[in-house]
UniProtKB/Swiss-Prot annotation:
GO MF: 4-amino-4-deoxy-L-arabinose transferase activity; mannosyltransferase activity
Membrane disposition: Multi-pass membrane protein
GO BP annotation list: lipid A biosynthetic process; lipopolysaccharide biosynthetic process; protein O-linked glycosylation; response to iron(III) ion
The protein's name: Undecaprenyl phosphate-alpha-4-amino-4-deoxy-L-arabinose arabinosyl transferase
Record gene name: arnT
Amino acid sequence: MKSVRYLIGLFAFIACYYLLPISTRLLWQPDETRYAEISREMLASGDWIVPHLLGLRYFEKPIAGYWINSIGQWLFGANNFGVRAGVIFATLLTTALVTWFTLRLWRDKRLALLATVIYLSLFIVYAIGTYAVLDPFIAFWLVAGMCSFWLAMQAQTWKGKSAGFLLLGITCGMGVMTKGFLALAVPVLSVLPWVATQKRWKDLFIYGWLAVISCVLTVLPWGLAIAQREPDFWHYFFWVEHIQRFALDDAQHRAPFWYYVPVIIAGSLPWLGLLPGALYTGWKNRKHSATVYLLSWTIMPLLFFSVAKGKLPTYILSCFASLAMLMAHYALLAAKNNPLALRINGWINIAFGVTGIIATFVVSPWGPMNTPVWQTFESYKVFCAWSIFSLWAFFGWYTLTNVEKTWPFAALCPLGLALLVGFSIPDRVMEGKHPQFFVEMTQESLQPSRYILTDSVGVAAGLAWSLQRDDIIMYRQTGELKYGLNYPDAKGRFVSGDEFANWLNQHRQEGIITLVLSVDRDEDINSLAIPPADAIDRQERLVLIQYRPK
C-alpha cells in the first residue's frame, strides 16, 4: 500500500512540475522560438532530412532532436506544450534511467525513488528540462550510453556483453544525430578512469568495435541522405560547429575555466547542502566499483567542458544524473548517521528563499530602484514572485522540523517556481523576449502583411511560428542564418539597411510591408535611418513599423 502511495505521489509531483504549468509560459527567443519553428517547418514541408529555419538551410545541428520536437507538435499541436513536449519526454526518460540504474547499483527501492525525486527537482534539470532546446535529448542519449556501458561490463556472458556494446553504439549514434560528435567524446572520457582503475581494458578492446559498428550503422542512413541532398553539410557541421565552437580562439560562448563552478552550485539547488558530502563520500568510497563509475561520470565531462573555450550551462546536464544518485546515497547515510548536511541544506533553502523575497521587494515598484523591474499595474506578478520564494523558504524550514524524516521535502522548494514563474515575468521582459506577446499585441497589423522584415533571428522565428509562415525576411543582420543566406536560392531573404529604401520602393505596391525592429528602451524611434512610415506601434523593446501601398 505504501508503494502505491509513493507512486501516486511521484505522478502528482511530475504533473505539478512538468505537465500542468508548461502551457502558461510563453516561448523564449531565440532558443525556443528557433526550435519551435524548425519543427513546424519540418511538419509543414514533410522534409525530415534537411533542417530549415525560415525556409533557409540550417546546419547548426543534426536532425534527431528536430524529429522528436516535430513529433511533439504533431501530437499536441503548435502550442507551448507541444513545443516543449519533446524535451519533457526526454527528461522523464532520463529520470527513468536514473531510477533503473540506482536500483541496479544498490538494490534499494527507497534510494531509487529518492534519486528520482532529487534529479527531477534539481534546478538545472528542471530549468533545461522544460525549455525547448536540444540539450535534454543529448543528455538522455549520454545517460543511456553510460547505462549501456555498465550493463555490458557487468554481463557475465559474451551475448550480454555484445548486446550492451551494441546498445552503447546505438545511443552514441543517436547522440551524434542529435548534437554532434561530442556524443562520442563525452562517454569515452567518462568511462576511461573506471576502466583504468578496474583494469577492464580487455573487455573494452574485445567488444568495443561492436559499439563502433552499431554507431556507424545508426548514423549512416541519414548521414548518406543529407550528404546526397546537401554535400557541404558535414564540412560545415564538423569544422564550424565543432572545431570553431569549442576549440578556436573565436569560439562561441567563450568563458573562463571556472565557469561551471557557479553553474554546479546554482544547478544543485535545492540540494546544494548535499553536494560536498556526496562528492567527498564518493571519493572516500572509491574502492567501490559503482562509486568510481558515478564519480567519473560526474567529473570527467565537467573537466572536459571546462577546458573547452566555448561553454554553456546546458553542456553539463548529463553530469547531474550521476550526481543525483550520489546525493541520494549520501543523504540516506546522513539521515541515519549524522544529519548535519541535511540541516545545512534546509538553511541554504531558507536563505535562498529569504534572499529572493528581499530581492523581489528591491526591484518591485515599492522598492528603492528608480527603474523597477515590474510596473505598478503588475503588482500581481510581484506577489507571484514573492510566493515563489516564500514557498521555497517554507519548505526549507519544513525540512528542519524533523530533519531525519522530513529532509526529502526539499524537493518541493521549487514548487512555487514551477507553478508561478509563467505569471511573474515582467512585461518589459515579455515584450523583448517573448515574440508571442508582441504578436498578440499587434496581431491585427501583422496578419495582412505581404512582407515582414526583422533584425533579429529569434524574433523572426517567433513571428514565423506564431503566424504560421516561413517567409520572414532578415533586415540588416543575418545572425546564425548567414550560412543559409549564402545559397543562390536564398536571394531576396535579406535586405541590408542601405538597400532598404530602394527595396521598399520596388515592393511597396505589392501589399503592406511590416518592419519589426529591436530597439533600446531609451532609443528614439525617430532617429532610425528608415523612410517615413505610415504607422508605428512601439511595444517596449520591439517596434512595429508599417508601410502601406501608395
